[in-house]
Amino acid sequence: MEEFKNIFEGLDVAYGQHQSEGKRADGKQEGKSYIVKKIVTDDLWQSHLDGEGPSLGIIPIMADNTSKWGCIDIDTYPIDYRKIINSIRKLKLPLVPCRSKSGGLHLFLFFKNPVSAKLIREKLRE
């Protein structure tokens, strides 16, 4: 758990949650997402990693407007995962692809040290 907490370090006074409500015809999971203004606890992390309860959405931007990671959320269906991953490899982009809970694709960009959230947003838009 500590490795995940370090990799996905973010705001510690609030987090996102999502309650699934089924699938659309195109395969995307539907549901409600919202912000919970409470401390992110080890119990929340462990429940999330165990696949229990509502999801835990770490807010990447910390209180000082820096972040150690960013994410591109691709929710265009159908998704050709192989084509996107091959493009990432071909272009040698520093992105880590992961299938999202909704059936989409998350492309993560990680940093060893916190950097300006504005810079991360600019780089992910390039």
Regions found by a protein language model. Name each.
Residues M1-W69, P78-N86:
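DNA replication initiation on ssDNA origins
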Residues I58-P60, I74, L109:
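Hydrophobic side chains in beta-strands
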Residues C71, L95-R121:
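Histidine-centered divalent-metal-coordination microenvironment in nucleic-acid enzymes
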